[in-house]
Design a protein with these regions (language model features):
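Short beta-strand segments that buttress and anchor functional surface loops
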Residues: 77-85, 105-111
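A generic structural micro-feature
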Residues: 23-25, 72, 85-87, 112-116, ...
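Hydrophobic ligand-binding cavity/cleft-lining segments
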Residues: 3-73
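Flexible, solvent-exposed loop/hinge segments and secondary-structure transition points
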Residues: 69-76, 97-99
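Beta-strand/loop substructures that line and gate deep hydrophobic ligand-binding cavities in soluble
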Residues: 96-97, 103-164, 169-171
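Short, highly charged C-terminal tails/helix-capping segments
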Residues: 66-67, 170-175
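Extracytoplasmic/secreted envelope proteins and their assembly/folding machinery
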Residues: 39, 46-52, 92, 121, ...
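Short, surface-exposed coil-to-beta transition loops
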Residues: 28-30, 88-93, 115-120
Length: 175
């Protein structure tokens, strides 16, 4: 009886591991909001890391988080590094491309609570009196993330933060 239960458990574990291994190697999380403001109003809030505390949902994860700004004041070459509690972790982001009022691209490197290297794009598209702002993050998904993804939806977790950040950008830009 014990050996039958053990075999069944091993088969279930093997099936879960095999299923996790077949999941996509890369991920993309994207959210979009329409803001009643021109791109010229929204763009500086994204392109200048010193303004991120006014809208980024990640700024509230740890009120004692240590932040370091270096490189350019804004735009390409601007760097933001942080180190905080278990929720905020430790990492660094750098603006690698900045096209006035239309695109900000970041290289995002996490050190803690896990290592990850992602790319982030903020795309601003004007349409009449409105601007469509898209926040997208792309990266590779190591096996452990594939396995965890069987039990939690990372798109929902990360997407929720993006939605809060975009709502904050909307509030600031429409004021």
């Amino acid at each position: 009886m014990f050996s039958t239960i053990l075999i069944i458990l091993l088969v279930i574990i093997a099936a879960v591991l095999i299923h996790a291994a077949t999941r996509p190697n890369d991920f993309v999380t994207t959210r979009t909001a329409t803001i009643k403001a021109p791109p010229e109003v929204i763009f500086p809030l994204i392109n200048d890391f010193s303004r991120w505390p006014t809208w980024s949902p990640y700024e509230k994860l740890d009120p004692n988080m240590k932040r370091t700004l270096s490189g350019a004041q804004s735009g390409k070459g601007a760097v933001y590094a942080w180190e905080g509690n278990g929720k905020a972790g430790k990492g660094r982001m750098e603006i690698v491309n900045s096209v006035a009022s239309s695109l900000v691209s970041l290289k995002l490197d996490f050190e803690k609570p896990f290592r990850a290297n992602n790319s982030v794009d903020f795309t601003l598209t004007p349409s009449g009196d409105d601007t469509s702002v898209t926040w997208a993050m792309r990266g590779s998904r190591p096996f452990i993330a594939k396995l965890m993804g069987l039990f939690m939806n990372f798109d929902t977790l990360i997407g929720r933060d993006f939605e809060v950040g975009l709502a904050n950008l909307k509030r600031l830009s429409e004021a």
